[in-house]
Amino acid sequence: MSLLRYFIFFIGGCTLALASGVSYTEASVYMSGLSGNENEVPSISPSDSRLVFAHKLGVSRFHKLKSHSGARKIINEMLHSHSELSSFFYAEKSNTFLTIAGLAESELFDTLNPAFRISSCPSSNAFASLMCRYERQLDSLDNGKTTDIYLNDIGGVISIHDSTGVYSQITTTPYKSLEDYEQLFGEDKASMFDISVKQDRVFLSEIYALKILVEFLSSKSQQERSDTSIVIGQLVGLEALYEKYGKDSKIYQVARENMMTLLSMIKQVSSTYTFILLPPIDSSETSTRYHKRQVDMEAFGEEIEEVVASYEKNYNGRCYISEEACSKATNDCSGHGRCSKYGQLDSCYVCQCSNSVVSNAAGQNKTIRWAGESCSKQDISVEFQFFFWFTIIGFGLLIFSIMLLFSIGQEELANVLTSTATVIKKTT
């Protein structure tokens, strides 16, 4: 990831922050397959939300999940709603993860409740820093590469993490963005924007980038092969318009509707999505930039030391030389077990996984078995064995039934049934 991107995040965050200060309202998070109860949407801290997002992106081994964390219940619900068994038989699809600044909860997905809310919502600049941390962790896990396919000069970015694909950047000009916007939403709405104004140009370019992203995700969804790419985006154009023109301005109202339209399109073509809606910043806050910078740095807490099993193992490469090394390398067995000595071997510590019990909407308990070196994978061996042998036995019974019917059909009928002689009744 380039230094230019970090510099743009910093400058963009400063620009928006100086205009409005710090916001402490709640952010709303929408996730595919997970919807909160209308009257009981859970609210968690920014630090707990970091753990949930890390699980969603597959980098939870970098983040320590405490036993009494507010994130644990939500993660268990995610595990219950997305069956590992179904993903075993069906191809994985791309994961879309977007943060949208300047959009409130009630303005999106009327029929869908947020999965959860984030209390004391950090700024968009803090979320941008968090996304960068996730991207570094993704790259270190699979030696993949995160490519910035779109980048503007106030912190907006769209990236794709993929270990195999090569992606070109989305480039446009102010005139091209305005022309494309007019084709999408009409001439009347396009006439409200002035490409000589920086905030207008940024928003139009983000709309153009989202349109290209919709086309990209649509083509991906039609492919039958597995797709493990992850799209991570940070959109700040709407927030910039809010700061420039105000929440009651016509241009902001139109831009908000445009953003909701494109997010709904992404929702339709993306099988797995996460939308983080950051509400418009409250301009009444008077905190200084120095205070805000400190808040941004501490907003999501600290993850564990960024290593991926780089601690020393013993000579056979299967055990860790100490309990501490095992605990650090596996993030305390991903919170699903504990490190203990293996047999009678000296300097050999491995994870002993334990089961988790989650409840579904009907109040029924479900046991989740964990496996793997760091207890980070669900053990579906029992379900697989049941499905496998059920299929084999069922297929065998089907063949046996067909053969039995075929053999019966080849036998000659008895003489009584095949006789054509007419029975004549005698009279006396």
Curated annotation (Swiss-Prot):
Residues 20-385 are lumenal. It is found in: Endoplasmic reticulum membrane. Its main location: endoplasmic reticulum. It comes from the Eukaryota. Keywords: Endoplasmic reticulum, Membrane, Signal, Transmembrane, Transmembrane helix. The keyword Lyase does not apply. The chain crosses the membrane at residues 386-406. InterPro entries: Archenteron_Induction-Rel (IPR053065), Vps3844_C (IPR024382), Vps3844_N (IPR049205). GO terms for cellular component: endoplasmic reticulum; endoplasmic reticulum membrane. It is a single-pass membrane protein. The keyword Membrane applies. One of its GO terms (biological process) is vesicle-mediated transport. Residues 407-428 are cytoplasmic. It holds the Pfam family Vps3844_C. Residues 1-19 form the signal peptide. This is Uncharacterized endoplasmic reticulum membrane protein C1709.03. It comes from Schizosaccharomyces pombe (strain 972 / ATCC 24843).
